[in-house]
Amino acid sequence: MKRYYLFDEHDELLLYHDGKEYTLPRLDLPDEASFHAFSADEVVGRVSNGKFRSSLPAFPEGHDLFAMPLRATYRLLSPADYQRAGKAWELLYWSEQTAYCGRCGTAMQWATAISRRCPQCDGEIWPQLNTAIIVLVHKGDEALLVKAKTFHRNFFGLVAGFVETGESLEECVEREVFEETSLRITNIRYFGSQPWPYPLGLMIGFHADYVSGDIRFADGELADGGFFRPDDLPTNADGSPAIPGTESMARRLINDWMEG
C-alpha cells in the first residue's frame, strides 16, 4: 500500500486528535495507484471553527482534525511520525518546484514515488537536498552563540550556512565561521545530522575549537553574538534560556556541550 499524508492550502499538516494524543491521518492506496500530491481540501471539508470534517471513511468519526505548521508538530507527534510528515512535505514542495522539465519545458510526470520523468526527452530527476552545516565553536568552557537577523524569535543559535559547489563539509564550516564572525577555528569534528524539511534540506552538525580573532559581524547576517558559559546563557524576559527549540540540530549541539 502507498501511504499519503495531507497538507492544506496553507501548507499546514493535517493532524488527528482523539482527546489524548495527536497522530497523522493518512490515505492508504494500492501500490498500482498513480501517485498524486493530495491536499487536505480534496478529501476533507473545512468547518467554521477552523477544524476539518471528514468526507472519507478512512477518517474515523468522532476524531477532531486540525491543521498545523509542520514545525509546530515536533512536540506533538512521535519522532517517527514527525519524520514521515517531513518527508511528505519535502516531496510535495519538490513536486511543485519541478512541474516542468528544465531542459525542454514539457510538463513532468511521476516515474516513481520519489522521481519524475519528462515524457518528451525522457530525463528523470530526483529531489536535490540543500546541504547545510551548523557548528558549535568552543573557547575553553565557553561556546559561541549568535543571533541571526532572520530569526523570527528572540534567541541565540549557532553559526550555520549552506555548502557551496566544490567545497567539503569541513571547508564550509571554516568558511562560514570566518565570514560571519571573523574568527579562525580548528579541530572540526562531526557530531550528527538530521533531515531539515524547511523546505528540502539536510543539516549536518559539527563541533570546532576557537583559534584566534575578535568577533566582527562582517557579512551582515548576524545581529549579535558572543561566547557564553553554560551557567550564563542569554535569557528571555521570563528568565528561560534564549536558545533554539529541542527539535533542532542547534539545540542538540548545545545540549551536548552543556552535558559534556
Q: Predicted segments — roles?
A:
Residues 13, 112-158, 162, 184-185, ...:
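N-terminal strand-loop-strand
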Residues 1-98, 152-156, 218-260:
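Nudix hydrolase/Nudix homology domain
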Residues 167:
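Surface-exposed, charge/polar-rich loops and edge strands
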Residues 84-134:
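Acidic, metal-coordinating catalytic segment for phosphate/diphosphate chemistry
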Residues 159, 173, 177:
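Hydrophobic alpha-helical positions that pack around
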